[in-house]
A protein has these predicted regions:
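Active-site HxH/HxHxD metal-binding segment of metal-dependent hydrolases
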Residues: 1-49, 136-139
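Short, conserved glycine- and acidic-residue-centered signature motifs
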Residues: 3, 86-89, 165
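Arginine residue identity/basic-tract feature
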Residues: 13, 26-27, 84, 144, ...
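Residue-level signal for threonine
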Residues: 21, 57, 154
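Catalytic core of the metallo-beta-lactamase
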Residues: 28-127
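Accessory terminal helices/loops
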Residues: 98-108, 117-168
Length: 168
C-alpha cells in the first residue's frame, strides 16, 4: 500500500498493469492483478513466487524469482537494514525477515531504496567487531565514491552483516 501514488496516471499514459496483494485490493487504486501469499505468478517470460511479508505495511509482498535466485524485497529488507514499520508490528516484521532468511544464500536481493551506506554505519555501532561487516563497509564506500549502486546484495552477505537478519 506504500508507493501507490500515480497508479491512475501511469495506467492512463502507458497502459500499465497494477499488481498488488489481494488483501490490499480496496486500498490500491486501479489494481488489475490480485496476488496471494505463496502464489506462483506467471507473466510474459517469467515466474515469481509471491511472498506476503507484512511489517512495513500490512499488505507488503515480495517477488521471489526462484529460478534466477533473485528477490525484490521492496521496503521490508534493505541492504544492511530493514524498513520502518508503518502498519505492521515488530513481530510481523521479525517473522517476515525470517521468511526471507529461508531463501538460498546465493539469492540476489534487490531492495526499494539505496540506504546501504547509512545502514552500514548503523550496523557498525552495534556490531563493530564483525570482520565481514568491516569488509562490506569498505566495499560499499568504494562503490559509492564511484557513483556505483551497492544493490544487489546477496542473502549470504546480509546474513553475515545485517543486524536485523542476525537478530534472534
Amino acid at each position: 500500500y506504500d508507493h501507490i501514488g500515480g497508479n491512475q496516471e501511469l495506467k492512463k499514459k502507458y497502459g500499465s498493469v497494477v499488481v498488488g496483494f489481494k488483501g490490499d485490493s480496496r486500498r490500491i487504486p486501479e489494481i488489475d492483478i490480485l496476488l496471494e501469499d505463496n502464489q506462483i505468478w506467471k507473466a510474459e517470460n517469467f515466474e515469481a513466487k509471491i511472498m506476503h511479508i507484512p511489517g512495513h505495511t500490512s499488505g507488503h509482498i515480495c517477488f521471489n524469482f526462484f529460478k534466477e535466485k533473485i528477490v525484490f524485497t521492496g521496503d521490508t529488507l534493505f541492504s544492511l537494514g530493514c524498513g520502518r514499520i508503518f502498519e505492521g508490528s515488530y513481530e510481523e516484521m521479525f517473522e517476515s525477515l525470517n521468511k526471507i532468511k529461508l531463501l538460498p544464500e546465493d539469492t540476489k536481493i534487490y531492495c526499494g531504496h539505496e540506504y546501504t551506506l547509512n545502514n552500514a554505519k548503523f550496523c557498525k555501532k552495534y556490531d563493530s567487531k564483525n570482520k565481514d561487516l568491516q569488509k562490506k563497509i569498505e566495499k560499499i564506500e568504494k562503490l559509492r565514491e564511484n557513483g556505483i549502486p551497492t544493490i544487489p546484495s546477496t542473502l549470504k552477505e546480509e546474513l553475515e552483516c545485517n543486524i536485523f537478519l542476525r537478530a534472534k
